[in-house]
Amino acid sequence: MLPLAVILSELQEPKTIVPVLSSLRSGSPVWSNISGPDQKHLVSRTLNLTRSSIQFRRWFGINVIRVLADNYKIMAGDGSQIIGQLLKLLEQCNQFTSAVYFKSLVECIDHVCDSIRGKPTMTRELLTPNLPAIIGLYLEKFSHDPAYLVSRLAPYIRAHPTTFRPFGNKLRSKIMETILSPAFSNFPDSSKDIFCNTLSTLCAVEKIEPEERWSSDLFSLIGELSNTLEIYGEFLNFEDDAELGKLLKKIPRSSSGESEFPSLSIDINDPSSFYSLPERLDILLRLIRGYLSAPTSFVAKVPLGIIALVVEAVLSINSRFIPFKREIRDESTKQIIRNTLQCAHSSALGLLKVLPSIFRGSLVPYMRRILGLLETLIPMKKKSLDTDQIVANEQFICLVLDCVACNISLVSYYQDSTGLVRLIDAAMAIVQPRSSSNTSSNTANTISSNGKKKKKQASVPLADVLSHQHLFNISVSESTTNHVQSFVNTLISCADLPSAQHNKVCKFVIVEAVKASHHIQEGTVPKQLRNLLVNAVLHPGFETTSILPIVCSILKEDELLSVFRNPRFPPVLKAVEVKEEEEEEEEEEESEEEPEEAEEAEEVVNGSRTEREVAPETKEVEPENKRRKIEIPEAVSVEPQVSEPQISTSLQHSISNQPEPAEPKNLRAPEPVKQANNPKLTEPSAAKDLREDFSDDSDFEMPEIDVDSDDE
């Protein structure tokens, strides 16, 4: 970073601009401790550069002002002086001013306005008073660089429509004058689009109902287009195509008011006059596209159905289906008319190409009919493709393929793939290797000759053609290959192609993959080709073969393809026996229940369960066989009043389940348990006798069992 003293000295005698601009940028340490006098000194030195008579110094000062405009303090203190000096420089520009200097000055003025716009106080004090002068100077210098100044005026129309209102008609007349000039056809497409888009934004300066002005302008353009299409009726028999007549009647006519477009003059004896017709159609279609694509600050209703009718009407005028009139007999005149029709079709395709990106799913109802019209644009020779015409009109075919891809991409699956057969064949035809016509004709003449050589020297170049014919092939341009790749990429992911066409597509993909193998050494594969290869693997169609090995050899580090090459399944779960888990759970439950049962057993032994036990009425000793029967669970369930047998049964169960039970210190219950289990009942009648004994209505009472007694 340069210190402030060095910057001031450099502004006095400028030599290199980059270090100065980098040191003055926003956030630089220079601004952290700059004083007020130093700031005034910096601004005055910069303004002195802009007042120099040397153009380089003025250009140097303009670029420094552009950097200083990011500083709020400088613009708040000296903004009015800076803007005034810039407007003086713009006023001094003339036809001898260099384009670099002029563009730098205009960009600096726009940057200063952008830095002020949005700040209420600065906008009120600096920008609003100077806006009329800025717009007026832009219109005054309009002839210096029309396309550039129109692009710079568009933001002022959107941001300041009220201030721009007095200049709206003047700008509109200048734009229309440029559009209707003969030189407009030589402008690049980007410049043409700028003029058309800016003209559509002028509707925002209307004081009342700008949306109505927008709609009326659009319908007037559509009516003018309909009138222009009827001129082709002077050369072609529209009466032979009833559908075309219906289409033209559905398109609204222009109003009876005076049109902004002058009438066309076409002389049948002057072939060059025919090209004014497609030029007028191109202007109208570009203007319609500008009205549809340019952003507006108001809500506008778009007649999408009429727009679709306009495109359909232009594409339906085709000399393949509509014959020429008898008056048109000259073959050269017919060929010129065919060429003008193709130019008109190209303009309509330009409008059709942008519609999917604007209206999306609203175009789906018109998609099938549009694709049918696009298929008719492919040159045919009887029932087969005219490959020579397809190759000769390579750019037009690429535009058709782009429109097809844009419309098919609106849906996730397109069912009617039979209508795409011609389009696929045409796409494959323009990417095939070609040989020049001169070499092919020379080769044919050589083969048809009788072997007589007039001169030995004449056969030298022909020998190269015969032995190394591949060196004379014309390579397909990269742009054409990209168009076809994009078209194929959309088709294989949205439609199931017929077997023959799918094989052609796969062959094309494999050839492109092999051609791209040299990119492996460079480490990069084009993104579009990468997507095409991946989609070709993901959508194999009805074929049993796969190009996965070839694609994997090229895209080795692709994560998606690595899943197909080395499938990674989820980790295998270990099988666990449920029985073991249940046994462990039972053991845990038993271990938790053992202390409780031990406490219950201790209470039973010590006679502490007085609350749960039912005291018997008598203390008679029960016979031995009766005591054994009480331990059976079935007998216990019969008498709900007796709870003592249930307690003894649970105690027995808890003790018998343990292999080596740990006896409590004062627990002496195991002895009566062993005595009760000593005799075994093997007869089934024992259980029956037990039930009969319990069901007997005798006066037998349950004696109290004294577990504390010592049998020994």
UniProtKB/Swiss-Prot annotation:
- Pfam families (alphabetical): RIX1 (PF08167)
Name a biological process GO annotation. rRNA processing
**Transmembrane helix as a keyword?**
no
Q: Where is the composition biased (Polar residues)?
A: 643-659
Q: Basic and acidic residues bias: where? A: 609-625
Biased-composition ranges, Acidic residues, are 579-603, 694-712
Keyword list (alphabetical) reads:
Nucleus, Ribosome biogenesis, rRNA processing
* Top-rank taxon: Eukaryota
Q: Which InterPro entries match?
A: ARM-type_fold, RIX1_N
> What does UniProt give as GO cellular component?
nucleus
* Segments for region (Disordered): 435-456, 575-712
What is its subcellular localisation? Nucleus
Q: Main subcellular localization, coarse class?
A: nucleus
Spans of biased composition, class Low complexity? 435-450
PANTHER family registered for this protein in UniProt: PROLINE-, GLUTAMIC ACID- AND LEUCINE-RICH PROTEIN 1 (PTHR34105:SF1)
Family, per entry = Belongs to the RIX1/PELP1 family.
Q: How does it assemble?
A: Component of the RIX1 complex, composed of IPI1, RIX1/IPI2 and IPI3 in a 1:2:2 stoichiometry. The complex interacts (via RIX1) with MDN1 (via its hexameric AAA ATPase ring) and the pre-60S ribosome particles.
Q: What does this protein do?
A: Component of the RIX1 complex required for processing of ITS2 sequences from 35S pre-rRNA and the nucleoplasmic transit of the pre-60S ribosomal subunits. Regulates pre-60S association of the critical remodeling factor MDN1.
Recorded protein name is: Pre-rRNA-processing protein RIX1
Per the UniProt record, the source organism is: Meyerozyma guilliermondii (strain ATCC 6260 / CBS 566 / DSM 6381 / JCM 1539 / NBRC 10279 / NRRL Y-324) (Yeast)
Q: Which gene encodes it?
A: RIX1
